[in-house]
């Protein structure tokens, strides 16, 4: 009977959700809002959404941030809705079609921006559609409806935030501190594996896990930043630690790859040193102190460059880690580390995927419009709203089909649950605000527990039930209206699910190829003598792309190794002492243009032609390096890069 069990850790958030719903309900009726349902629905969604995503009680700041995004999305949607209505009030059908395109446009943008901010754009898309559909009988009331909707949503968000603060939300700071310690130990153990040069699959698993953990730590940093302004210093340090952690992974993996061709570079001194096992961050601290003494004794020239760079990055990591844990004032040494290179933002590789999402949302909304006009069903507008909601919110997630199924299950569960409230509970409690609040608190409490378990349909059931029960001012009980609303939700979700199934997303392979070509372009762009360009920090963006590649192609080790090799080539060439002269500078610009053409090529033939041109230019570039007497630190990584591109040219050019 575990399915009905209530764990202790789930109770606090369930009470928090119930409190948010009750507060929104009380305030909505107290201020005589026309539809307090919107305030209650907003409070429930803002509070429960982060809990469903986290699989438990969300950390401090998550609910506030989601509420902030909802306010932004609502205001953008309301303004867009007003503009569309004012411009096209004389052509109602065209007005609705433009709203469908607007919803698709917002979904397209939400597919390209950071996933944390995509919620606001998805909301902006279907908010405009809700306004246009709702004011169809009385278009002159549009400004009043937009203002009322914004007011009700702001009230719901404030109630959710108040409930969150009332029940002392969890701080993520202790989790961050523990992860910093554990991550440093894991970094040292990865370097041990790479120096031993053992089983490649074990090394692949180790660095893959570290990439995921570093990405997760970056997510924790975002949560900590949302939690309170007092963590501003810790946030700055964590941002630099992210780059240092990625540097440690890169240097470790390069140490492994170097031994494939030149194992003699790693001397017995370092092999014996890294044989000592470590279990805690304190062990790593002791080993790093000893390692710095060994390097001082052997000299920088006798130390492999990857080990020297790794030790330098690990030392800086340790220094910043202590600052994060104590949250003390940033000293001069730390400030020097934090004043690092500016991070580079890379263009999204998911443009084709975003266009698929645009068509899914637009076509599903147009299909809903045709269904509404053809049937003349009074709740066709409700079906359209659900179509827009499902497609706008589902498209940005890794598995839109499962999100649509979750909504279908939720709306089906909402029918009997809403029926119970509509026919029995609310008619018998509407005369008493206390009883009405208690009845909705019970609903919020039990669904809050299920939401934290990520039960299929729980989130959809919470929103759909609140949406169909009578929480208007004044309350009117028309069974046909209730049934229409409930069935409209179900039909809308089914239509959205149908469109998601019919409009297939085949962009995965294209996205993977674009990502790999972006790695190639980054490696080529590192060959420059421009001081400002050499100081740019590409590492976070490159590993963000690698993380996306790992999510798109789980278990595809050849792709991961190729991407990692390109990242290593980029880092090595970025620091290489390339001779400074106009001849090489002009050729660097030419190679960058060719690499950009490879990424932007529309057909396989063009892509192969430009890629072949890039390989030829790399051969010429190696000859130029010999003419200008470039040192081995330059010629060797360029030769390795050219060899890798020759070896994998089919994977990088074919669809």
UniProtKB/Swiss-Prot annotation:
A Pfam family it matches: FUSC
Domain of life: Bacteria
Annotated TM spans: 13-33, 38-58, 69-89, 93-113, 121-141, 152-172, 370-390, 407-427, 431-451, 459-479, 482-502
Keywords: Cell inner membrane, Cell membrane, Membrane, Transmembrane, Transmembrane helix, Transport
InterPro entries for the chain: PHBA_efflux_AaeB/fusaric-R, PHBA_efflux_pump_AaeB
Segments on the Periplasmic face: 1-12, 59-68, 114-120, 173-369, 428-430, 480-481
This protein's GO CC annotations: plasma membrane
Stretches of the chain found on the membrane's Cytoplasmic side: 34-37, 90-92, 142-151, 391-406, 452-458, 503-655
GO MF terms, alphabetically ordered: transmembrane transporter activity
Compartmental location: Cell inner membrane
Any one GO biological process: carboxylic acid transport
Topology versus the membrane: Multi-pass membrane protein
Induction record: Positively coregulated with aaeA and aaeX by AaeR.
Family: Belongs to the aromatic acid exporter ArAE (TC 2.A.85) family.
Role description: Forms an efflux pump with AaeA. Could function as a metabolic relief valve, allowing to eliminate certain compounds when they accumulate to high levels in the cell.
Listed name of the protein: p-hydroxybenzoic acid efflux pump subunit AaeB
Organism from which the protein derives: Escherichia coli O157:H7
């Amino acid at each position: 009977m575990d399915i009905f069990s209530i764990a202790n850790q789930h109770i606090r958030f369930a009470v928090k959700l119930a409190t948010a719903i009750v507060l929104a309900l009380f305030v909505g009726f107290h201020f005589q809002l026309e539809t307090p349902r919107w305030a209650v629905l907003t409070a429930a969604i803002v509070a429960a959404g982060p809990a469903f995503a986290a699989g438990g009680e969300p950390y401090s700041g998550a609910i506030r941030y989601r509420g902030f995004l909802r306010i932004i999305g609502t205001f953008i949607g309301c303004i867009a809705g007003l503009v569309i209505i004012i411009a096209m009030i004389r052509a109602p059908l065209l007005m609705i079609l433009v709203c469908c395109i607007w919803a698709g446009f917002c979904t397209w943008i939400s597919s390209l921006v950071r996933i944390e901010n995509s919620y606001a754009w998805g909301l902006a898309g279907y908010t405009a559609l809700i306004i246009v559909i709702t004011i169809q009988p009385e278009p002159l009331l549009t400004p009043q409806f937009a203002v009322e909707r914004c007011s009700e949503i702001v009230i719901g968000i404030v109630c959710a935030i108040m409930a969150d603060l009332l029940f002392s939300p969890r701080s993520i700071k202790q989790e961050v501190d523990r992860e910093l310690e554990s991550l440093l130990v894991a970094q040292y153990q990865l370097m041990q594996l790479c120096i031993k040069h053992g089983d490649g699959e074990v090394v692949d698993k180790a660095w893959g896990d570290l990439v995921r953990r570093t990405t997760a730590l970056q997510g924790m940093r975002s949560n900590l930043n949302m939690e309170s302004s007092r963590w501003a210093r810790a946030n700055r340090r964590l941002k630099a630690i992210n780059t240092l952690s990625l540097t440690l992974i890169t240097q470790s993996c390069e140490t492994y790859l170097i031994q494939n061709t030149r194992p003699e570079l790693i001397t017995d001194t370092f092999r014996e040193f890294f044989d000592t096992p470590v279990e805690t961050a304190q062990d790593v601290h002791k080993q790093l102190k000893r390692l710095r003494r060994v390097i001082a004794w052997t000299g920088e020239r006798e130390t492999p460059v990857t080990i020297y760079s790794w030790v330098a990055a690990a030392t800086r990591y340790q220094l910043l880690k202590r600052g994060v844990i104590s949250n003390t004032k940033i000293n001069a040494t730390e400030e020097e580390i934090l004043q690092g290179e500016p991070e580079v933002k890379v263009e999204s590789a998911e443009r084709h995927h975003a266009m698929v999402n645009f068509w899914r949302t637009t076509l599903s909304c147009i299909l809903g419009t045709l269904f509404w006009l053809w049937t003349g069903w009074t709740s066709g507008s409700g079906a359209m709203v659900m179509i827009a909601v499902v497609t706008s919110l589902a498209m940005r997630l890794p598995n839109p089909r499962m999100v649509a199924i979750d909504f279908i299950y939720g709306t089906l569960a909402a029918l009997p649950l809403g029926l119970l409230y509509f026919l029995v509970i609310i008619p018998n409690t509407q005369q008493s605000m206390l009883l009405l609040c208690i009845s909705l608190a019970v609903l919020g409490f039990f669904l809050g527990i299920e939401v934290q378990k990520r039960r299929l349909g729980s989130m959809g059931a919470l929103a759909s039930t609140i949406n169909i029960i009578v929480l208007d001012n004044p309350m009117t009980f028309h069974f046909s209206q209730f049934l229409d609303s409930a069935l409209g939700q179900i039909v809308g979700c089914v239509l959205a699910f149908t469109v998601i199934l019919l409009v297939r997303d085949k962009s995965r392979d294209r996205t993977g190829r674009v990502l790999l070509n972006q790695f190639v372009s980054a490696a080529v762009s590192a060959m420059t003598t421009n001081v400002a360009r050499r100081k740019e920090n590409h590492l976070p963006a490159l590993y963000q792309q690698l993380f996306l590649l790992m999510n798109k192609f789980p278990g595809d080790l050849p792709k991961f190794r190729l991407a990692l090799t390109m990242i290593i080539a980029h880092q090595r060439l970025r620091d290489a002492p390339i001779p400074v002269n106009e001849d090489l500078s002009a050729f660097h610009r030419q190679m960058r243009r060719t690499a950009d053409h490879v990424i932007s090529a529309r057909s396989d033939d063009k892509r192969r032609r430009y890629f072949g041109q890039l390989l030829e230019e790399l051969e010429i570039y190696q000859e130029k390096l010999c003419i200008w007497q470039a040192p081995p630190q330059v010629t060797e990584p360029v030769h390795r890069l050219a060899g890798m591109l020759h070896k994998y040219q089919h994977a990088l050019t074919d669809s």
